[in-house]
């Protein structure tokens, strides 16, 4: 009914996510870790997990995926060389990562690159991080969406690419996304919506296709003025999920 693939979809509403409150962001990281552990099969067992940072690091609003990967604790190479004893642990997930870039840079579909890496490194699960397009200005930089249904890179801004999901890769794919841009038509629609809320037609624009006059704005995407700081802050929040520690209480 929603036009989405079947799966589990979780939205973490975090209104203060745009604020530089370290304690708040730590709580969000811990809750996100809980949700990941619920979605990744057999997470209590040691696994090899590949984290994919989707997006273009040269476009600030689209750099969330690459920024998260930059901040991750990567250990696959060390464990394969020296074993878990290098970290003083008896039990530990192996974490690897890749930033496949965008087709304009590589000439390849993101799904092709990821599939090649999966075939060579054989991870048990895939975690994909991407910036999303918001359906409401109230969600901009304020929600974290998690799903086990995979992801279609670029679909939020109309660039439809091959899907990255369990069907195409053969392993569980968990997608994490934060809306960092919103199209101009949505901004106008939200503004009009707020003006007619008392008229008894609340939800008029949200529940319908945009009128023709607004549809001309659909190719224009807007982000917040402090998006560089916001993306950097969000990247730390998403990277502190402690996914490498299977014995962690959450």
Residue positions per predicted region:
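Glycine-rich phosphate-binding loop
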Residues: 111-162
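Short glycine-rich or small-residue beta-strand-to-loop segments that form or flank ligand, phosphate
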Residues: 11-15, 48-58, 97-101
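Gly/Ser/Thr-rich active-site loops/lids in small-molecule metabolic enzymes
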Residues: 70-76, 143-169, 197-206
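A structural-propensity feature for long, helix-poor, extended segments
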Residues: 86-117
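Long, charge-rich alpha-helical interaction segments
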Residues: 191-224
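Extended, charged alpha/beta regions that create polyanion-binding interfaces
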Residues: 1-46
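Glycine-rich phosphate/diphosphate-binding loop of Rossmann-like nucleotide-binding domains
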Residues: 56-93, 97
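Single conserved hydrophobic/aromatic residue that forms the stacking wall/gate
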Residues: 241-250
């Amino acid at each position: 009914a929603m036009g989405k693939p079947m799966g589990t979809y979780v939205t973490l509403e975090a209104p203060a996510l745009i604020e530089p409150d370290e304690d708040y962001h730590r709580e969000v990281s811990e809750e996100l870790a809980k949700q990941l552990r619920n979605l990744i099969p057999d997470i209590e067992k040691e696994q090899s997990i590949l984290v994919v940072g989707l997006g273009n690091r040269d476009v600030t609003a689209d750099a969330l995926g690459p920024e998260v990967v930059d901040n991750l604790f990567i250990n696959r190479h060390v464990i394969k060389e020296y074993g878990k004893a290098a970290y003083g642990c008896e039990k530990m997930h192996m974490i690897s990562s890749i930033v496949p870039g965008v087709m304009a840079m590589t000439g390849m579909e993101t799904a092709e690159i990821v599939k090649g890496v999966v075939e060579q490194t054989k991870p048990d699960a895939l975690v994909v991080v991407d910036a999303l397009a918001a359906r409401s200005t109230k969600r901009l930089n304020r929600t974290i969406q998690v799903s086990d249904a995979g992801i279609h890179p670029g679909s939020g801004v109309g660039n439809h690419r091959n899907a990255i999901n369990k069907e195409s890769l053969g392993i569980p794919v968990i997608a994490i996304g934060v809306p960092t841009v919103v199209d101009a038509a949505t901004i106008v629609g939200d503004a009009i919506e707020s003006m007619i809320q008392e008229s008894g037609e609340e939800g008029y624009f949200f529940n319908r296709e945009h009128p023709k006059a607004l549809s001309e704005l659909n190719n224009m995407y807007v982000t917040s003025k402090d998006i560089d700081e916001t993306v950097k802050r969000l990247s730390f929040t998403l990277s502190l999920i402690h996914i490498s520690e299977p014995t962690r209480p959450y």
